[in-house]
């Protein structure tokens, strides 16, 4: 069982970089469907992904049709859209014989309407109030992906953290780091 986050023609490099970091932290494959709204080596995207780029399995697809041709018979594809009435948390993502693909549309216009109609039974919604048009793409990815991983028992992920084994602890255990930020009140 493998999870995939699929971004259809993403426009904002910082969102894509943040999503790549989430994919690195969850052992999730990131599929990018072109055209992208930025260059893959964009500085903002690189910064948002920090130094985790070597930990991300990124797969590029020329267009939506090219991506669809990569799906196998046991793959489950879900389209995340505000136009669905089915809640993403009401789906079972635990079949070990399936790979799960979570497809997210571009930040401004979402997924193509014809694509959503063709796969209408695969559309899922993240609940939200009518106070906003939509959630941030990166936040939406994290919500859906972590629900799938929760159901799957967080495979190959730390579910607790022990500070004494933290490879970064020396960088965060320096009092001067905090004193510098406190200032005088």
Swiss-Prot record:
Keywords assigned: Cytoplasm, Methyltransferase, S-adenosyl-L-methionine, Transferase, tRNA processing
Residues forming coiled coils: none
SUPFAM superfamilies, per the entry: alpha/beta knot
Listed GO MF terms: RNA binding; tRNA (5-carboxymethylaminomethyluridine(34)-2'-O)-methyltransferase activity; tRNA (cytidine(34)-2'-O)-methyltransferase activity
GO terms of biological process kind: wobble position ribose methylation
Catalytic activity from the UniProt record: cytidine(34) in tRNA + S-adenosyl-L-methionine = 2'-O-methylcytidine(34) in tRNA + S-adenosyl-L-homocysteine + H(+); 5-carboxymethylaminomethyluridine(34) in tRNA(Leu) + S-adenosyl-L-methionine = 5-carboxymethylaminomethyl-2'-O-methyluridine(34) in tRNA(Leu) + S-adenosyl-L-homocysteine + H(+)
InterPro entries: Alpha/beta_knot_MTases, SpoU_MeTrfase, TrmL, tRNA_m1G_MTases_N
Compartments it resides in: Cytoplasm
Domain of life per record: Bacteria
Annotated S-adenosyl-L-methionine binding sites: 80, 105, 126
Protein EC: 2.1.1.207
Gene Ontology CC terms: cytoplasm
Role played: Could methylate the ribose at the nucleotide 34 wobble position in tRNA.
Protein name stated in the entry: Putative RNA (cytidine(34)-2'-O)-methyltransferase
Native source organism of the sequence: Lactobacillus gasseri (strain ATCC 33323 / DSM 20243 / BCRC 14619 / CIP 102991 / JCM 1131 / KCTC 3163 / NCIMB 11718 / NCTC 13722 / AM63)
